[in-house]
Amino acid sequence: MAATNAVEAGYGGAAENGGCAEGLLGSPMRFSPSSKLKVNHGHFMANINNNAGPGKGGTAAGGTSPTREASYANVSGSGKVIENLHQQVDALTSTNLQLTKQSNQLLEKLEGCNAREAKYLETISSLKHENENLNSMLNRKTRRVKDLDMELVQLRTSHEEATASHNQLKYQLENKFAHETELEQQCQLLQAQYDAVVDAQRRYREHYQKEIEELREALEALKKDNDKFLGEHMARLTRSQLDIDKSMSDYNGKFHRMELSQKEAVIELNEKYDRMRADLDVDGWIVLYKQMRDIAFDYAKQLDLSLPKEFAELHGEDGYYAKMLDEDRQSSPVSTSSTAVEPMSQPSPSMSAQTLSPPPLRVPKNRTPITKRSSFYGNTMPGANISLTSATGLLPGVKRTGSIRSFHGRAPSEGLSDTPTIFTASRNASPMEFPQRSALTSAASANATVRHSSVPRHRRNQSSQVGNNK
């Protein structure tokens, strides 16, 4: 068995050496010296001898074993097997030696081929470099030839253009000479005509001088008649202007008296508004609204309830009503305890008249579904296309409509406006309370400072209802 294992090991080494040789043959670019194959062959033969020696010695030493008689039959059979294996090993060894020689020869050929290939590569690189140089020279020569061709074409074109221009100028020169001869003949003819025209013009000048003198005398007469007519017309216009100025003075007096009555009504309405606001305790309602809003949000938070989005938009910290309350808080309170009214100065007769239409009413006659829906929440609702007017003290359930009140009308201590004022009347005012506006001069408009306000009837009626309910 030991001999069999040794033979198998030697065969495996030979196979490995054969595989190495095949690998070297399969990859011609790998360079390996031939001495390495010889060294491997020597190790292979030494392994065979070492493995075979102990087997034979064991057999020889086995003659002193007690079981020598029983193993004679096995020795004769295994000897034949060993001889066959030795023959196979010798055949494989000779085959391996032949393959080693062939591989050495192929390696020598491969080295020669690699050397020739390196020389060929050097030759190819030098030829490529030379080819590139020749191509660059050829390209330069080709570009030079193209440039010369283009220059030749341009020169031919320039020569043709110069020839055509020369012929054209020659033709024009001949035409100029012929035209000059014609012009000389026309000049002589025109000179004769000019002399005739000068003589006719002298005679016309004398004739028209006489007509101009006659027209000048007629114009002087017309000027005198026109001055007389203008004087009479200006006298009539002056009388008409005096009548108009007198009518304007009467009208301004009536307007001043009507304005005073309107201011008294406005002051009384403002005082009623302030008293009703104080009676309703608007600030207390605001505090109560905030407390109820906080309680509602705390209740929803503790019970883990989700409030509607519309409720948060209306009653949240940044909601619609919170913004309106902030605007109401920022607006300064006004007082109607005193009023400064200066009498209007009488306009001069020379002032110009302007007719101004009375301002329109702000309360709509028809109620749309949006205004009906906003009767509980106030003036406007989020999402409705209605202009928002700042109001003071807006409460849920109380509708506040916008009013036009100038700041100097409620607080005389803040200063009076010098701009032309706009008068606005309430809906339930009498027809005589609507003032008629006329244009004043700059001095009269600077002295006339009047505060004005309007309180819509709907707001006063609703405030009265809230006061009665309270």
Curated annotation (Swiss-Prot):
Protein name: SWI5-dependent HO expression protein 3
A Gene Ontology biological process term: mRNA transport
Function field: RNA-binding protein that binds specific mRNAs including the ASH1 mRNA, coding for a repressor of the HO endonuclease. Part of the mRNA localization machinery that restricts accumulation of certain proteins to the bud and in the daughter cell. Required for the delivery of cortical endoplasmic reticulum into the emerging bud.
Entry's Gene Ontology molecular function annotations: RNA binding
Annotated organism of origin: Eremothecium gossypii (strain ATCC 10895 / CBS 109.51 / FGSC 9923 / NRRL Y-1056)
Comp. bias intervals (Low complexity): 343-352, 438-449
UniProt KW keywords: Coiled coil, Endoplasmic reticulum, Membrane, mRNA transport, RNA-binding, Transport
Ranges of biased composition (kind: Polar residues): 331-340, 368-378
Gene Ontology cellular-component annotations: endoplasmic reticulum membrane
Location of region: Disordered: 48-70, 327-378, 430-470
Chief place where the protein resides: endoplasmic reticulum
Entry similarity comment: Belongs to the SHE3 family.
Location of this chain's protein in the cell: Endoplasmic reticulum membrane
Recorded coiled-coil stretches: 82-234
Pfam families: SHE3 (PF17078)
Membrane topology term: Peripheral membrane protein
